[in-house]
Amino acid sequence: MQKKRTGRMLCSLALSAVTLWGVSVTAPAKDARDALRSLKDETLGVMLLRYERGDGGEDFLSLRTSLALHATPLLREGEENIAQAWSAELEQKPDDSADETGDAQDREGTVLTQEETPDEIAVTENGSPARTLKASDPSGYTVFGNVYINNGSDAALDASMLSGDYAAKLGAEGPQVLIIHTHGSESYTMPPGQEYDVSDTFRTLDTNCNMIRIGDEMAQVLTDAGISVVHDRSLYDYPSYSGAYNRSLASIESYLQKYPSISFVLDVHRDAVQDANGQQFKLLCGEDKNAAQLEFVIGSNGGGLSHDLWRENLKLACAVQETLYKDYPTLMRPITVRNSRYNQHMTTGSLLVEVGTAGNSLEEAVNAARLFAAGFAKTIQNGT
């Protein structure tokens, strides 16, 4: 993979040197202006790294424009900085100021307690046993309305802190919701005959089967509801899982700079739930057995990093969960609060949502994503 990236970089530089004269003559002025404007809107290092990685999307830059950009004085003046950024990307060194513990916690997943593990396991069509997790005993939870919150952080939390409306609001113009996937290669358990090519355990680069597909479904529901969405379809956890939150943070910062109208950021993942023996379980909504259960994971300042407004994100999560509870009381699992920030310090409308588990099927996750997106849209359009 590293050889492929390096080859792409050398090839693009060589082509730019050979074709500079032709590009300068034939490249449309508007195309060049738009490309340079994108340089202004997005940090140069991030933009070029996205290009070299090949994850900018089909409409990122045309070939002629890319070649022209490689030869601009702006790029030549910043060659040293770009080289340093490229080296850092390959080495995947974590930023000491960032929230690296999130990667490790997400990889660990959830282990069912003995009480949550059924005595008799019924295997479903994709080979995974099924459970529906719900809280019935308020002991150990912070309870706010119909929402149960498991505070696994060192930050103080009381139900009285969650009263009032959440802070984030829809704007009048421009993109309003950013959907991103810090761990985009996470995937599900497919039925026999529908398997995908794996890149790691329960992970794939096939965007029709991983979290990118789930984000596509959410984006479509939100768009149909009249909400403007930016969906980042990049994979930040491949080829290295470590450092994914650093890389997605750089993109979130870039999007918020480019689109200041964005008030809500959804980082869409899937969970991994297993018993003490390592058996993967699927989690299903009790009211719709064709839909997986979802869970909000809310970051805090419990780990010592600055995140004073984290409870605003939690208030939003509670509002969305109350909306969904009316029709699907068990669609959402209890909310989990952790010490890590998960990049949620960037807005007061940032949520990490786990759609299903590694044991769920893609179809169950898609159905859950669409139900969730409809409830999320209804909540933020009502504003309370």
Task: Please report, for each region that a protein language model flagged, where it lies by residue.
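N-terminal Sec-pathway targeting helices
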Residues: M1-L15
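N-terminal catalytic or cofactor-binding beta/alpha core of small enzyme domains
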Residues: L13-I262, A272-G278, R370, K378-G383
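Envelope-exposed proteins and targeting segments
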Residues: E173-Q176, A225, I262-F264, N290-L294, ...
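Structural recognition of the beta-strand scaffold that forms the well-ordered cores
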Residues: L178-H181, V229-H231, F264-D267, E295-I298, ...
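Solvent-exposed loop/turn segments at secondary-structure junctions
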Residues: G184-S187, L235-P239, R270-D275, N301-G304, ...
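A short, glycine/acidic-enriched catalytic loop
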Residues: D197-T201, V273-D308
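Active-site-adjacent mobile loop/cap segments within catalytic or ligand-binding domains
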Residues: L331-T384
